[in-house]
Amino acid sequence: NVFRFFPGDVVVKAAHARYAVEELGVKRPAVIFQTTAYGQSGRAELDRNLTALGRPAVFAEGLDVSVKDMLPVLSKVRESGADALLLHLHSGPTALVVRQARAMGLDIPIIAGSAMHQPETAALLAPSELAGVCAESGASPISESDPATRAFADAYRTAFDREPDAFALGQYDGVQKI
């Protein structure tokens, strides 16, 4: 048997796209994704959902995980006339895109993937770089008010001396179910 305790791209990318279009009013989204299997899956779901919402991406490009200079792709985002940038990248590239976008004055909302919600990713950025940035996440144990989730978060901090992320909560839930 296979157990999965973290929602897949079919779920989170639907929410990612809906938030951009329905909550932020995005009309011309750009998408930057990783060229890994992870990135391809997320990109496919973002494409499907943005198109279904009547807001297909005006620009989309994949990046290898090793890319450090994001200015070429960010320049293409700017040239496309995008009014928001949706990311489906790993942690390091997410931080690089956000930092370099802000440094070049690309002042559009950035709706990142779950990597941005990881405390380690946010710690790579200055608070000023995070202005106008949000992220989708399957869960947010550091934001929950539910007593059981708060107890998990407190125990996690005590055991690991760091903030729990959605992946930690998913693993915890998985072990509890077994």
Predicted features by range, described:
Residues 1-105, 141-151:
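Extracellular/periplasmic Venus flytrap/periplasmic-binding protein
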Residues 175-178:
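Non-catalytic, well-ordered alpha-helical segments in soluble enzyme domains
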Residues 98-172:
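Extracellular/periplasmic periplasmic-binding protein-like sensory domains
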